[in-house]
Amino acid sequence: MYEKQTLPNGVRIVYEHMPHVRSAAIGVWVGVGSRYESPCEAGSAHFIEHMLFKGTAQHSASELAERMDAIGGQVNAYTTREGTCYYARVLDEHLDRAGDLLAEMLFTSNFSETDADNERGVIREEMDMYADTPEDLVTERLIGAAFPGALGRPVLGRPATIDRLTGARLRSFQIAHYIAPRIVIAASGSFTDENIARLAAHFSWLPVRPDLTMRSGSYTPAFTLKRKAIEQNQISIGFPGLPTGAEERFTMALLSSILGGNMSSRLFQTVREKNGLCYAIYTYTASFLDCGMFGISAAVGRETEQRALALIRDELERFRTDGVTQSELDRAREQVHASVLMAEESTASRMNKLGYSELYLGRVLPADEVLARYDAVTREDILGLARETLDFDRVSFSAVGRLRPQEEYAQQLKG
């Protein structure tokens, strides 16, 4: 059972003891990602994530790296459209040191112009890496097209905006956005009350500040093509989805599992197993605080692309007309049951659940309640959501590769 403290300044601490483990995972979750940036600030949240590893008032970047390695654990971070997470997984005897290290990085980083110039090159290389990965590129372009504005902008920013972000501007962005109401500290594993008190002390000095205003987002049907000389065409189809906290999210997870979540799923069986038209095909959800998208991705040959798209459309139409069988629903439930319960055995997974749920949902659902929500979903619920979601009048499409004219894709998908 998890516990929660809220400090007087609004910082929240959620933690859960796991008996019989010798390690702990801690994370500092900051509810600030790329959708909180103005156009001229694009890429700031991600750039700051990099800069916090480049040296503090007490230690150089190399000394920070040595201190990380000296505790024999894993220390890292990542940025999304709606948040940034700095986390560590260590043996319980090193938990205080890991917490001290994260706090030092968060509050005393240098943001020197020399470090910013060097890290700018690293981020450009990261951009190039994603641009050379068609599976990532096609989804990034789909989200960018379907969610115009701040939400759709790349988390990494663009080269032109990155070039204008100085160390001083990044520090100003951090001061303005890393505020108490936006911070959640999550811990799971082996720890003591004293460990939690020490973590709290690192954040108790933050002043009380008004919360930030989020730039709104909404789904808009869009088509985007990127011509690239690669062997396979990477395609991604999008439909309007659900926001993070929607009650129907449990229904959507089962719908996604049945359509494209595993080897027995409809799309995998139809497009790959029965017709041999692809190696990989899967469904996914992209959920944000106020909107979302349901997506399907596949890698197909240029010569078989039209047939694969026709089969995908036919399967989706059949799904929204006929619904699912009881055996399909039973298999999907077992899949999510296994996923939920296996995650409960990992300190890192439980820490992530605590931090994510508190930050974006305002409440952590116990595993038993999550399973009960899945068990309550009926075939009729899935059919109703499928008919609402899989609407080809609101379809979006992204493709990367040796492509046909856009009108042909639009005609094939929209009819």
Show where each model-derived region lies.
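Charge-rich, well-structured scaffold segments of protease-associated domains
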Residues: 6, 17, 63-214, 225, ...
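His/Glu-based metal-binding/catalytic segments typifying zinc-dependent metallopeptidases
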Residues: 27-29, 210-266, 403
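Conserved catalytic motifs of the protein kinase core domain
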Residues: 23-25, 293
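M16/MPP (pitrilysin/insulinase) zinc-metallopeptidase core fold and M16-derived inactive scaffolds
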Residues: 25-89, 258-277
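Short alpha-helix boundary/capping segments
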Residues: 36-43, 243-255, 259, 263, ...
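Short strand-connecting beta-turns/loops that link adjacent beta-strands
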Residues: 19-22, 80, 230-231
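N- or domain-start disorder-to-order transition segments that initiate the globular core
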Residues: 1-23
